[in-house]
Amino acid sequence: SDTITAWVPLDGSTLDGGAMGYIAGSHRFGVRKFVDIFSGEPEDLLAAPEVRGAEPIFVEVPRGGVAFHHGLTFHVAKPNRTPRTRRVHTMIFFRDGCTRASGGFHPSVDRAGIEAEQAIASSVTPIAWPRASGDLPEPPPPPVERLWGWPPPRRDGVR
């Protein structure tokens, strides 16, 4: 519950292009259900009794902008009805000492091998603040699997 997410649509987001919508105040409902958006069947969280009847507020974010939301905020994206790919980067910030609630799939903590009830603390989830001046964490290791074509070749042909 002590997390904040930065949602960064790299090309901006529009209502036709997959804008994110939020249920106002839903982070206070006490619902702690993680939905795996990467696999499995989609689940309609908007049908939950706590949210029934609430309408998401969709936010268009301009290129270069960031939308922040509490980790327990119910959120949903509109479908992308444009010919462009919706490119988004997400960063999740955890409070120092935060523990993993369950063992369900979550890329932010799975990469570091953090089990349920363990503190979320690793080179992949460094403490951002406070840190002593000059005390920088070691960079995280690269992902095991690389996406096709990434990283792009450098101009000198070296990867």
Where does each model-flagged region fall?
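Double-stranded beta-helix
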Residues: S13-V76, C98
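Short, structured patches in soluble enzyme cores that scaffold and shape functional sites
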Residues: V8-G12, A24, F93
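Noncatalytic linker/hinge segments flanking ATPase motor cores
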Residues: D11-L15, A19, V31, D44-E55, ...
